[in-house]
């Protein structure tokens, strides 16, 4: 499946699926990152309402694993919105357009470019992707106990 970016129309190809992933395989991941922009809206689409979309089911499973670092940037919070319990009471940031969504999910909107709340890293916009990525890399090194190169 190929997605195309909204602004620059850059292709993003998905060759693998998270559907049917075993718990052991899921636990083998150090981190998962929810993409920004319209792709997160598309990923939350379900053909069988009220059943949540496969991507939402995957996100719920990933959030249940404290050993997996979760990253959500910008409009990526759209993918979390069908599962508000995942961020309820947690400090997050998202695109300013999603402020109402974040509050309605019960999360604590924090006016910072990047916010870390335990195993969850959120960033305001795609323009903060370098800070977001650096934070995730730093946390992965910290968790591994390895020295940074």
Q: For the regions a protein language model found, what residue spans apply to each?
A:
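Extended, subdomain-level signal for the structured scaffold at the beginning of enzyme domains
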Residues: 1-67, 78-88, 99-149
């Amino acid at each position: 499946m190929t997605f195309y970016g909204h602004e620059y129309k850059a292709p993003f190809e998905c060759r693998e699926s998270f559907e049917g992933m075993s718990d052991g395989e899921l636990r083998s991941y150090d981190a998962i990152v929810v993409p920004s922009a319209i792709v997160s809206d598309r990923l939350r689409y379900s053909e069988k309402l009220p059943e949540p979309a496969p991507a939402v089911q995957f996100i719920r499973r990933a959030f249940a694993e404290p050993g997996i670092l979760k990253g959500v940037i910008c409009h990526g919070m759209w993918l979390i919105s069908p599962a508000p319990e995942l961020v309820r009471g947690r400090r997050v940031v998202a695109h300013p357009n999603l402020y109402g969504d974040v509050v309605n999910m019960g999360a604590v909107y924090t006016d910072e470019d990047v916010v870390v709340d335990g195993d969850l890293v959120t960033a305001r916009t795609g323009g903060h992707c370098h800070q977001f990525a650096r934070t995730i890399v730093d946390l992965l090194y910290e968790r591994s106990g390895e020295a940074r190169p």
